[in-house]
Regions:
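Short hydrophobic core segments
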Residues: 12-14, 37, 210, 254-270
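C-terminal segments that line or cap access tunnels to active or ligand-binding sites in enzymes
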Residues: 179, 258-260, 265-410, 429-430, ...
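Mobile amphipathic helical/loop "lid" adjacent to a hydrophobic cofactor/ligand pocket
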Residues: 72-163, 171-175
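N-terminal Rossmann-like FAD-binding beta1-loop-alpha1 element of flavoenzymes
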Residues: 9-36
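Glycine-rich active-site loop/strand segments that organize a redox cofactor
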Residues: 44-68
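C-terminal lid/capping helical subdomain adjacent to the catalytic/cofactor pocket in oxidative enzymes
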Residues: 413-513
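Helical element adjacent to the flavin cofactor pocket in flavoenzyme catalytic cores
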Residues: 168-217, 233-259
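Glycine-rich FAD pyrophosphate-binding loop
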Residues: 28-53
Length: 513
């Protein structure tokens, strides 16, 4: 814990995931006093690593990274690190995914998709993938495969995924490589990130529990002459501090005064904070609770398997083709674990927890026992890799079973872009309270990812501290990279120019004759 009692900060950032880390990194460049607050004992949010059984790795995964993460790469460079230092090329690509889909699509369905891709526009953000596929007569097999791809790539089913986001998978990612971390993120990425913040004077408090927010009127901190100037307006309210304590033990509360508070969390976590602290009220408007319910990432169940021996696992894309939609990545093909118990490691995820197993006739949510779920996940994994021996270790650590609702509830949450759009950063009640994350829509990258998280953070930081733009810091737009549509458009222009030139040349030759 590094927050001194009754300290004053320019910024208190709640949430130690990629958004919070990026905010702290960028705001520290303005020489502001920053406190980063994280409720867990590790940083990274959904990208973080949980250690169990004397240091064995588990994760909320599997996760991927792409080399068109331009803003993320810029932040890495600011930390003195290159993208390739931390990540290695994945054995599969966006083309792998498209080829999987082409196996079941008819010529008519392919032509329909191509036309929609070439006419891609913002109106597609108002249409779900299911609405599009159903209205254009796609087969059940096509709908099923697109639903499974959506669940694997961006945490959404066909009835929540927007048509715009789905087509952007191809447009923004097809020409780029997919990567995996070279080492677990707590050893690589987040250790480097934390060290950088510490060197720049950012205070970091892990295992932090929020006792309360200190709220009042802006006029309390201003001259009495200003107090009579419409201070009854809701916008005159401010959050002047936050009271924290160490969640691991009974400890004296720590009062941290602040000029601004940023909840760097997905909407579900922001709403949890609002519900737990009535002093904040409906800080982001009366419709925020409904918004967070309608934009929730699918409740995945992550399971990880470790073997003491180095196995020859076939190179097969971990597409969720099984009855529970079990997807996977063989992490040991890419990561160095430096642990004799982890010579082979497969990270698996149940993307369809409500679908029944063809063997058990039960869904994952019907089974409230960890061992029962892990046993069935491994059985379905063997449908992909038939020669897998029984694992030496297996863990389900990222979810807990809620017996009342009969479902596995993940510890980590994320935002899913749906037809319900995005929300603004600033509170409607408090001048100095903000939420920040993918839910704000200030990234041209269409997916819930490391890139969209940090891009939204940089956008807010430069809004709050405009002088950062003078340092050349700005949100890099994905459209500044090469996309498939840009290449196609350029090719059409080139062909048009060539045809025009050929026609003119032919006409001129005719005149000479």
């Amino acid at each position: 814990m590094q927050c001194d009692n009754e300290e004053e900060y320019d910024y208190v950032i709640v949430g130690g995931g990629p958004t919070g880390l990026a905010l702290a990194q960028v705001l520290s460049l303005s020489l502001k006093r920053v406190l980063l607050v994280e409720k867990r004992d590790y940083l990274g949010g959904c990208h973080g690593v949980t250690r169990v059984h004397d240091g064995m790795m588990t994760e909320h995964g599997p996760r991927i990274y792409i080399d068109n993460f331009l803003m993320f790469t810029q932040l890495l460079n600011d930390m003195g690190v290159q993208f390739d230092d931390l990540f290695v090329k994945y054995n599969f690509s966006t083309a792998t995914m498209m080829l999987e889909a082409l196996r079941v699509l008819t010529v008519r369905e392919i032509a329909t998709l191509v036309w929609s891709f070439m006419t891609l526009n913002d109106s597609f953000k108002e249409t779900t993938l299911m609405e599009y596929l159903s209205s254009h007569g796609f087969s059940n097999a096509a709908i099923d495969i697109f639903d499974r791809i959506g669940r694997l790539t961006d945490g959404g089913s066909a009835d929540t995924y927007t048509l715009f986001s789905f087509l952007q998978i191809l447009n923004q990612n097809f020409l780029y490589g997919i990567y995996q971390p070279r080492v677990p993120n707590d050893v690589g990425l987040f250790r480097i990130w934390e060290d950088t913040l510490m060197k720049r004077g950012v205070s970091i408090m892990k295992n932090a529990a929020i006792d309360r927010f200190i709220v009042g009127n802006a006029s309390d901190a201003s001259d009495a002459s200003d107090a009579s100037d419409a201070s009854a307006d809701a916008k005159a309210k401010v959050v002047s501090g936050i009271v924290l304590r160490d969640s691991r033990a009974e400890s004296r509360p720590i009062v941290c005064g602040c000029k601004r508070v940023i909840l760097a969390c997905p909407p579900q976590e922001v709403q949890r904070i609002l519900s737990a602290h009535s002093e904040l009220g409906a800080a982001f408007g009366p419709g925020f609770d409904r918004f967070q319910q309608e934009t929730q990432y699918l409740p995945y169940i992550s399971v990880i398997f470790h073997w003491r021996s180095a196995l020859r696992v076939p190179t097969i894309w971990g597409y969720p083709r099984t009855s529970w939609g079990v997807g996977n990545i063989v992490l040991s093909d890419y990561m160095e674990f430096n642990d004799p118990r982890s010579k082979t490691v497969i990270s698996a995820v149940v993307t369809m927890p409500d679908r029944p197993s063809e063997l058990l006739k039960l869904s994952a949510n019907d089974i409230g026992d960890k061992r029962g779920v892990m046993r069935e996940v491994f059985r379905q994994l063997k449908q992909i890799y038939p020669d897998l021996p029984e694992p030496d270790y297996q863990f389900l650590t990222q979810s807990a079973y809620d017996a009342a609702s009969r479902r596995w509830v993940p510890f980590n949450h994320a935002f899913m872009t749906t037809t319900h759009g995005h929300v603004p950063n600033q509170s409607v009640l408090y001048d100095n309270l903000y939420n920040c994350g993918v839910q704000n829509g200030n990234s041209s990258y269409s997916f819930t990812s490391m890139e969209s998280s940090v891009a939204n953070a940089v956008h807010l930081a430069t809004e709050l501290q405009p002088e950062l733009r003078l340092r050349g810091l700005r949100v890099v737009k994905v459209r500044e990279a090469i996309t498939v549509r840009a290449v196609v458009a350029a090719a059409i222009v080139c062909v048009g120019v060539a045809c025009t030139g050929f026609a003119m040349h032919k006409r001129n030759r005719g005149r000479v004759k």
